[in-house]
């Protein structure tokens, strides 16, 4: 176990995806993860930046859930639309579906209500969010 491997796991990335994020060959990422080579500070910083983004988005999402519950009453559950592929995850500001899922896991773990995950655009609320400017 190395810091690179631990941070990649926390970020929801495979080693292949972590290598892509850091702009290196996949075998370099594998060597950093196994400790055969030390990951440079820039690679660790990129993972930390992604994790900070995941935490920021999760915190904002939870704040929105709480605000809506206070305004309209707590629902039995909430629905969150998930990206179907990496391209869609990238349109949401995440490098891949796994990174989005790591953010969503933080929301699910801390949400005061049950969370249901559905494909983005498959129901009325997610479809409106997909169509909204800036989404």
Describe the residue ranges of each PLM region.
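DNA major-groove recognition helix of helix-turn-helix/homeodomain DNA-binding modules
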Residues: 15, 23, 41-57
């Amino acid at each position: 176990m190395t810091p690179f491997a631990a941070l990649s796991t926390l970020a929801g990335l495979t080693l292949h995806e972590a290598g892509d994020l850091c702009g290196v060959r996949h075998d370099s990422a594998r060597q950093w993860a196994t400790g055969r080579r030390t990951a440079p500070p820039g690679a660790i910083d990129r993972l930390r930046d992604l994790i900070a983004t995941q935490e920021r988005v999760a915190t904002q999402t939870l704040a929105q859930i709480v605000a809506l519950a206070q305004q309209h009453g707590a629902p039995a559950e909430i629905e969150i639309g998930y990206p179907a592929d990496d391209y869609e995850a990238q349109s949401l500001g995440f490098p891949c579906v796994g990174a989005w899922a790591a953010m969503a896991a933080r929301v699910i773990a801390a949400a005061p209500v049950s969370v249901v995950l559905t494909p983005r655009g498959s129901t009325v609320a997610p479809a409106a969010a997909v169509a909204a400017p800036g989404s």
